[in-house]
């Protein structure tokens, strides 16, 4: 089991990649006016584009490792975007709250992917789905993995119970809030 990055270019993943890039482009254009004369504008743009690239990696993922890598990079980028104005009093607290909830989500995803691997003995998403749909049986690993995946998605997409980090993360600059809390992150969930 050697981790490697594998991307899938099919019509659905290309469409969602285009959607992520389009939302990212409009956010980048907005940032140029929002941060006029801001000293750390380039740092913010760096983390913003890391977030966008992470979303694209997540959408194009062909195997569990690439999916998890994109998922983790989204969490890391979110942390730095929320904590961008770290001179504000509540910013560090809110960024760690978001980080903690995302860490719980990450552990659920990692556990779910391990369950799926134990069930199918593959890390390729297409092969996994083919095996599950053609040889479906409600096994312990599949059921546990599915439940963990629902918990993971609920936290990341701020559903009931996993939404507690969202209001505090509004400490981030407006462009970060708009990107993180728009359909891009909800789509990831």
Range-by-range predicted roles:
Residues 1-189:
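...captures the hydrophobic TM-helix bundle architecture rather than a specific catalytic motif
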């Amino acid at each position: 089991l050697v981790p490697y990055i594998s991307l899938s270019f099919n019509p659905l993943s290309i469409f969602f990649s285009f959607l992520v890039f389009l939302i990212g482009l409009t956010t980048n254009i907005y940032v140029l006016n929002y941060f006029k004369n801001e000293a750390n504008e380039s740092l913010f743009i760096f983390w913003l584009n890391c977030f966008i690239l992470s979303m694209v990696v997540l959408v194009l993922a062909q195997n569990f490792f690439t999916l998890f890598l994109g998922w983790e990079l989204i969490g890391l980028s979110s942390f730095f975007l929320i904590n961008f104005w770290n001179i504000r009093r509540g910013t560090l607290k809110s960024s760690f709250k978001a980080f903690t909830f995302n860490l719980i989500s990450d552990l659920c995803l990692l556990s779910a992917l391990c369950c799926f691997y134990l069930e199918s003995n593959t890390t390729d998403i297409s092969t996994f789905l083919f095996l599950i749909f053609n040889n479906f049986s409600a096994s312990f690993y599949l059921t546990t993995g599915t439940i963990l995946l629902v918990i993971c998605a609920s936290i990341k997409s701020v559903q009931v119970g996993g939404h507690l980090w969202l209001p505090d993360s509004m400490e981030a600059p407006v462009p970060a809030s708009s990107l993180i809390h728009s359909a891009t992150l909800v789509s990831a969930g």
